[in-house]
Swiss-Prot record:
This is Probable serine/threonine-protein kinase CHK1 homolog. It catalyses: L-seryl-[protein] + ATP = O-phospho-L-seryl-[protein] + ADP + H(+); L-threonyl-[protein] + ATP = O-phospho-L-threonyl-[protein] + ADP + H(+). Serine/threonine-protein kinase which is required for checkpoint-mediated cell cycle arrest and activation of DNA repair in response to the presence of DNA damage or unreplicated DNA. May also negatively regulate cell cycle progression during unperturbed cell cycles. Pfam families: Pkinase. SMART domains: S_TKc. InterPro entries: Kinase-like_dom_sf (IPR011009), Prot_kinase_dom (IPR000719), Ser/Thr_kinase_AS (IPR008271).
Length: 414
């Protein structure tokens, strides 16, 4: 039996689960359990080899790996949240915080590239934070080496998340380092604006096509970015042969400007000041009027190699007053009916699927458990944007009558 006591599931995907765990001495960690039938041993060993070799203050710490009857397991240090969940939809991060996290992101990626490793799935959802608020880059399931037998090699397998993938990745032959730079550039746009500039960097995408035509960032959300930062975004999203290395990005005047949150080592100087810049989440009225099919299988697409971590953008817990489980489930269904959200009951869960304000699929489940002083509803995001999920949960909570003193809404931290 492994020395780790597996606890609640924080996230699950098609090939693996991430579970909270306790190590000897009651140290907190997470264990990614990969089903053997779904992932070849060589892929697991590659991820372990890469992650084990990394030592950087802005990269989530590798702890251990093992194999048991349940699957291949990777043990990592426990994060305290997710950068993606701190980003306000349509508003982004506070400018000081956006610069702080971008500096730390580029530092981590520069370290990776210095070891001839490219990440291939850089996005805010793969950026955790530690207890001091520092960024921790995570998810190395798609990572690979780009220097082999003394020669730089071009990569050919598409990997990553569509919105953050460089155009050449869709074409089938690309430089892994420069593809990471592109993903960092798109992440910077999200940091600054709270919105994605396009759905995918291909000619058929109207917003991307407009960006390529203008090269001036005249469309939303790019139009809201300052000139100096926008100049950097444009350089990072230039054609592959004109795109700078991450080391060059690190020397950019916008990146190098002083930041009161950073100490001499590039870590957070004042955690209280940092967390004061994170806006408290408030409810936002949304209309979910065009439900999708409940749990319809999405079209095949490159996605994150690991299940999405259940950070504060993935799980919402709603604590309500005295009620039976049956009544609580009925109230959930009635609330979803009122929101015109497609749903179905599966045992003690309600599965739901709808479209958000960006016309993208948002789906998940609502579970109910009985507590000593009432019921707890756990709303879990399966697919969709973290910020849209937060808005959805606020509207659902209000529909459940949870805007009074009897209800408490908490977003999970991992």
């Amino acid at each position: 039996m492994p020395k780790y006591e597996l606890q609640e599931t924080l996230a699950s995907g098609s090939t693996s689960k991430v579970k909270r765990a306790a190590a000897p001495g009651n140290a907190k960690c997470v264990v990614k359990v990969i089903r053997k039938k779904d992932v070849p041993l060589r892929v697991f060993l590659r991820e372990v080899k890469i992650h084990r070799s990394l030592r950087h203050p802005n990269i989530v710490g590798f702890v251990d790996s093992y194999e048991d009857c349940h699957g291949y397991c990777i043990v990592m240090k426990l994060g305290c949240g997710e950068v993606g969940s701190m980003i306000r939809a349509g508003g982004g991060l506070d400018p000081l915080l956006a610069h702080f996290y971008f500096r730390q992101l580029v530092s981590a990626v520069e370290y990776l590239h210095g070891k001839c490793i490219c990440h291939r799935d850089i996005k805010p959802e793969n950026m955790l934070i530690d207890s001091a608020g520092n960024l921790l880059l995570s998810d190395f399931g798609f990572s690979t080496v780009f220097f082999h037998k003394g020669r730089r090699r071009r990569l050919r397998s598409p990997a990553g998340s569509l919105e953050y993938m460089a155009p050449e990745v869709f074409e089938g032959a690309y430089d892994g380092e420069l593809a990471d730079v592109w993903s960092c550039g798109v992440s910077l746009v999200v940091f600054l604006t709270g919105a994605l500039p396009w759905d995918r960097a291909v000619e058929s995408d109207e917003r991307f096509s407009a960006f390529v035509s203008s090269r001036g960032g005249c469309q939303v959300p790019l139009s809201s970015i300052g000139d100096q930062a926008m100049g950097l975004v444009m350089r990072m999203t230039a054609k592959e042969d004109r795109r700078p290395s991450v080391s060059t990005v690190m020397k950019d005047p916008w990146v190098m400007q002083p930041n009161e949150l950073l100490d001499e080592s590039g870590l957070c100087r004042d955690s209280c000041r940092l967390f004061s810049l994170v806006p408290r989440q408030t409810g936002s009225a949304l209309h979910f009027t065009q439900p999708g099919e409940v749990h319809k299988t999405p079209r095949t697409r490159p996605v994150s190699s690991q299940p999405r971590r259940a950070g504060s953008g993935d799980i919402c817990r709603v604590y309500i007053g005295e009620e039976s489980l049956r009544l609580a489930l009925r109230r959930v269904c009635e609330a979803l009916d009122g929101m015109v959200v497609s749903h179905r009951i599966a045992k003690e869960h309600v599965m739901f699927s709808t479209v958000d304000s960006r016309r993208s699929v948002l789906s998940g489940e609502v579970g109910v458990i009985r507590l000593d002083e009432g019921c707890c509803m756990t709303i879990r995001r399966a697919k969709g944007d973290p910020q849209e999920f937060k808005r959805f949960t606020r509207v659902l909570a209000e529909s459940l009558g949870c805007n009074g003193r009897k209800c408490t809404i908490l977003y999970n931290e991992i």
